[in-house]
Amino acid sequence: MFSSITFIGSSVVVVLLAGYWAQKYLPPPKPKIVGIDLGTTFSCVSVYYAGSGRVEVIPDDKGRKTVPSIVAVKSKSQRLVGYDALEYSDHDPSRVLFDAKRFIGLHFNEEAFNKEKRRYPFRMWLNQTEAVYHVANNNETNDANKELNIRPEEISATVLMHLKKMAQKHLQVRRVEKAVISVPAEFDEVRRNATIQAAALAGLEVMRLISEPTAAALAYGLHQKANVSSVIIYDLGGGTLDVSVLMIMGGMFLTRAIAGKSILN
């Protein structure tokens, strides 16, 4: 009886020691959720390592940590993203689509749309109240459809897919399937749902949409500062300016007011 108890006790000690050494010396588990800033002009993807508390912004093959939110549609089956699309704009700017974030989930009347589309080198048309990109199809497959109509969600999805592949390669995992994505505070339910739809097209499940001012406040640890109760967040992006007033209560952020300009020119 005594020997059995001794054996069991020794086994427990061995298991505990093995767990300790494994936790101390084995590499930490790979992050399963990425954070994405899907910007108007630039986007980036990052991961949080729970063991160390470290946040890493994932670079591309050339070490760049931001990706232009641009897609060049060479044909129905071939698209370029980011810096490759930016280079292609010198060749054919009418095929290089951008500013999808301005249009995603947004509805226009004809007058407002006609004023907006004049700002761009590519073609767009109004499908009822939704802005749609319009690109000639390079007919490499003799497709009867000579024109390509591309929704803003599809362009955002292409950028998200590019970021997803960057994360998979950097983390050396087969699949990244979950993400937290930041969106402007002024995005209503329709525009938020359109962003979720774009993520789904890229094969990403959105665990949460977080407002960009809240994301900035969290990044600076303002929720952990006892002497901070209110804060103004200025978000000066590549083509937009947003200002938000946040209240901090019990570690939570409450948006009290928002203002901004979606087109800086």
Can you say where each PLM-predicted feature lies in the sequence?
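Conserved thiamine diphosphate
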Residues: R119
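Short, solvent-exposed beta-strand/turn patches at coil↔beta or beta↔helix junctions
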Residues: E130
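Short loop/turn segments at strand-loop or loop-helix junctions that form parts
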Residues: A136-N138
